[in-house]
Structure formats: C-alpha cells, structure tokens
A protein has these predicted regions:
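Beta-propeller folds
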Residues: 1-484, 490-496, 500-501
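Serine-hydrolase catalytic core recognition
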Residues: 460, 474-563
Length: 563
C-alpha cells in the first residue's frame, strides 16, 4: 500500500493542470535539462576615467584647430581674455593628481597651482586673467566640521599660497573662512572680496552620545521683542546658518580687513572702484516694524577699507541711498515725502534736490496701501558733474553743487503724454555723456505708440523723433565697434521680430527674423484700443478689446471683463 500511494502522488505531480484563459498555469511538466558548459563572460578593460567623478574638458584653439582633452575635471574657469584656463582635477591615475591647475593658452604650458587638498571650491579670476583665488580644505566628510582656506595665485608664482584661514590676522577670533560666500576680484585686481563667519558652535548635550532623543532639548523660544516673528525665523533659519560676512584682502600687501559683521550685515561692494570706504546698511533697530509695515527705515554707514571702522552717515532713511560713480555723493528717494535727497559724503551736508519743483518724482499712479516709489534715475554724468532724474514723462538734470534743475527734454514728454527713458547704448559705460545727443525710448501713454527720440543731455530742448509707430518698439542694442543697431517690433498680431538698422537714426531698417510665420495656420485675434467714461467720476478711461480673427459682428459672443 505504501508503494501504491507513492506512485499515485508522483502521477499527480506529473499531471498538468488545465489552462484557464487569462491565467498562467502554475505547474508545468518538468523537463530534464542537459547540463550546459558555462563560458566565461568577456571582461572589458577598465577605463581609468571611471575612477574619476569629473568629466572630460576639451580646450579648442579656434585659430589652429588644435584641441587638448583633459579628463577628470571637476570645475573650470576660462578667463575673460582667454589667456588662462584654470581647472580642478579629480584623481584619475597616478599621473593626474587631484588639485588646481592652470594652462597658458598662448603656449599650452600647464602649471600645478595646488594639489593634495580634499576639496576645492569656487574658483574666481581677475579681469586680466593673471590671478585666481579659490577655497580649499584638507578636512574629509568624516570630520565634524570643514575649515576652508582662501588660496591665491598670480602669474609668475610657482604655486598658490594660503592667504586667509583661521589663524590669519584680520580674521575675527573664533571665526573662519566661509565657503558659503562668493569670491570677487576688484576690477584693478588689487582686492579680493570674500566672506568669513563664526565657527560652528555645539552645546554640550549635542556631543553627548549617552542622551536619548527624548532627553535632548527640542523647543523654539520666541519673545515679542524678537526682530522677526517665529514663522519668519524658521523660514530664514537655513539662510542664517549659512550667512557670511564680507571681508577684503589686499592682494599686494596680504592685509585682511573685516567689513561686515553681525551688527552690520549688509555691505555694498563696488568692484569697479578701489575706494577707501564701502557703504553698509543696518535695519536691525527697525525690524520689529516689519510686522505691520514692510517699508521700514534703515541706517547707513561708511566702512573704512583700511581699518574696518564704521561711521554713521544717515539714520532712519526711508529709501535706498546709492553712491555716485566717483564716490562723492549719496542720493536717495525719500518715500515719505516723495523728494530726492543728496548727501555730500565728505562734508555730511544733505539737501533736497526736488523741493519746490512743479512736478512729482513719486509714482503719480501709485494705488496700493503703501508709500509710492520713485520713477528712478538713469545715473550720473562724468566726474559726478550732474545727476539725472526721471519724472512720469521727462528727464531732469541736477547740479550737485547748486543751481536750478533743468528739464533736459523741455517738458515735451508731459505736454504730449510721452514717457522718455535714457538708452545706454554702450553697455560698459558707467556714466552718461553730455556731449552730442543721447537716444531715449519713447512711449505715448494715450495712443500706445512707441519708438525712439534723441535729446541733448546738456541743454534743454525738444527731443527729435527718430521713429514712432503704433506698435511696440524696443530692445535697442548697439554693436560695440560699429554704427549698427538691433531693435524688436511687435503688435498683438505681429510677433516680436528682430530688425537691423544702419545707426540709431534707424535708417535702412531690415527685418532679420520671421518667427511669426509659425502663427499663420492658427486663428489668432485682433486687439482694439477703446475709450469709455468712468461712471464714478466721469474720467475718460481706456481698455483693450480682444476679438477672434474670424469675428462676426452679427453673432453674440460671451465676454470676459478683466480690470
């Protein structure tokens, strides 16, 4: 009986189950497989680049057609003038060590600036391309904290040297170089700006491994006297953790000067000038007011670039003062009274520039529950000789040494409801030339026509219209070394195409692009400027009526009103 039972069980195992449609059979008849001889899979040779976390960088000579390939590159920087290529190697093999290297593009010579550090960050070069600064650290990810150094190299030196770390004179006690900051050279190359920050601080309980999670403090304490409310503190916690404070390095003497700190967090650095001071702003005494007023006052200081000492210039300013190009004056728009003010930095004297003038320099159409901002300023003329201001329509010239303000556009804008704004054709220019005629954009507030006019910035006369059409004309760009310009023209029905002209006189205007052709197969629409009287006060208003291209005036259409 035992043998018969065993035979029946074997028969059941070998019997296949019926196949149900849509369901796979769970059991299949086993087939005896012949043993196969295993063949080893081919082993591909190891690519040495696989060891690197970097990528391949190709330096191509456009004149000769020659190229140089560099593998394992983590970061690179080609100088503005193209005379040096700086890059960071990640270790690929025994021949290529990790580090910062430089290639002289004129002769192809490569120089190793530094190697052996664990991490390099944020390479920055000067304008001439003969200097580089970067952050480096020997700390690994296993260390509790990373302490970075600032390293600097200039052409002619054998290697880069550490110019700032925790031990350098000028770095505050218990502070360190912050890799969260950016590195910037001044235009002259004589200064490097970067950031420092307090070293990480740990409470005793944080390092105590015997404490359970429930035994560790985890509370948020807030007081009504705190500068920011608790939700804002939480929102800014990450930024505050990574905050750094500006410091200046003199590349010739190696001297460090701390410019910013916890009491003066915001410093305005103009890398185009090597002045003996920088402008700093402090809003800490007024931050509690942000709970009910976003337009809070601010105190402004000048910080000596020799000593780091701060001198108060303006207390409780309701505006944002900015320095003139030569650094002689501070100008700002006071949002409380709507006037422009000027301070002589040397004497500290302040005067109202727009008091008694017949027009407003604050936004006349401002309609929100806040103080109106200004129409802005196009800037200064050479040597801080004149300061220019915008009103709603025209441009004004103000003499910082005294005298009456002059309406450069002679009131033409207000008389014709045309808003005019200065066009900076030389993108590298820092001041406004008062010689010859300047190009201004023009926009008719009522007809919506736009174009360009020219004006004498040193006098007072009606502008001369260059081009004015019932379409949007803008985006004026002038060639650097030729009297050629590009503009863009468009309407609701015509795409913003690019046009070229022989000069700012817009002669020989030629269409260069034809992107609008892609719209031809589609039913587009029309736009019509209409006028109506406001039933509330009788004022004449304007609106745009959009209709489909195949609009039938005999049909009724649904209408959406947006106001």
């Amino acid at each position: 009986p035992l043998k018969e039972t065993k035979k029946k069980e074997e028969a059941v195992e070998e019997k296949e189950e019926p196949v149900v449609e849509g369901r796979k059979s769970k059991r299949k008849k086993k087939k005896k497989e012949e043993p196969k001889e295993e063949t080893p899979e081919p082993v591909e040779p190891e690519d040495p680049r696989a060891k690197s976390k970097g990528t391949e960088l190709v330096l191509y000579n456009l004149k000769t057609g020659e190229s140089k390939s560099i593998t394992g590159v983590m970061e690179y920087s080609l100088t503005e003038k193209g005379n040096h290529l700086f890059f960071e190697y990640d270790k690929v093999d025994s021949l290529n060590e990790s580090g910062i290297h430089a290639i002289n593009t004129a002769n192809g010579e490569m120089t190793t600036l530094n190697e052996g550090m664990i991490e390099y960050k944020k390479m920055s070069t000067d304008e001439e391309g003969n200097q580089i600064a970067f952050f480096a650290t020997a700390n690994t990810k296993d260390d509790d904290h990373k302490y970075f150094s600032l390293m600097h190299w200039s052409a002619g030196k054998a290697s880069a040297t550490i110019v700032a770390d925790t031990t350098t004179a000028g770095v505050p006690e218990n502070w360190m170089v912050s890799d969260n900051s950016n590195i910037r050279f001044s235009e002259s190359g004589k200064r490097v700006y970067f950031g420092t920050a307090p070293r990480p601080f740990e409470y005793a309980y944080e390092a105590d491994t015997t404490l359970l999670k429930d035994d560790r403090p985890d509370v948020d304490v807030w007081s009504y006297n705190d500068p920011y409310i608790q939700p804002m503190q939480k929102l800014q916690a990450g930024r505050e953790k990574n905050r750094s404070f500006d410091v200046m390095l003199d590349t010739q003497t190696g001297k460090l000067v701390q410019l910013a700190g916890p009491d003066l967090e915001s410093v305005t650095i103009d890398t185009r000038n090597d002045r003996d001071f920088v402008l700093a702003m402090n809003d800490q005494p007024y931050r509690t007011q942000m709970t009910w007023d976003t337009q809070i006052p601010r105190d402004f200081y000048k910080i000596s670039t020799s000593t780091g000492d701060a001198e108060l210039l303006i207390k409780g300013a309701k505006g944002f003062p900015s320095l003139s190009p030569a650094g002689n004056y501070l100008t700002w728009h006071n949002i409380e009274d709507g006037h422009w003010y000027m301070m002589n930095v040397a004497s500290g004297n302040i005067k109202n520039l727009t008091e008694g003038m017949s027009v407003s320099f604050a936004n006349e159409l401002h309609d929100s529950p806040s103080l109106a901002g200004s129409y802005g300023t196009p800037g200064w003329s050479d040597d801080d000789a004149a300061f220019f201001l915008y009103d709603r329509y025209d441009i004004w010239r103000v003499d910082p040494k005294g005298g009456s303000a002059v309406n450069v556009t002679n009131g033409f804008g207000r008389q014709n409801k045309i808003t005019m704004r200065y066009q900076r054709l030389d993108r590298e220019a820092r001041t406004i030339s008062t010689e010859g005629r300047a190009t201004l954009s023009a926009f008719n507030e009522w007809t919506k026509a736009s174009g360009f006019v020219t004006a004498n910035m040193n006098g007072s006369s009606d502008p001369q219209i260059v081009v004015m059409e019932d379409m949007s004309i803008g985006g004026l760009i002038k060639a650097k070394n030729a009297d050629r310009v590009l503009v863009r023209k468009s309407t609701y029905q015509e795409y913003s195409e690019v046009y070229a002209a022989n000069s700012v006189s817009m002669t020989g205007l030629k269409k260069l692009s034809n992107v609008g052709a892609q719209e031809e197969p589609y039913n587009w629409g029309t736009a019509e400027l209409i006028e109506f009287d406001n039933t509330y006060d009788g004022e004449t208003m304007q609106a745009i009526l959009y209709k489909p291209e195949n609009f039938d005036p005999n049909k009724k259409y649904p209408m959406i009103a947006y106001f």
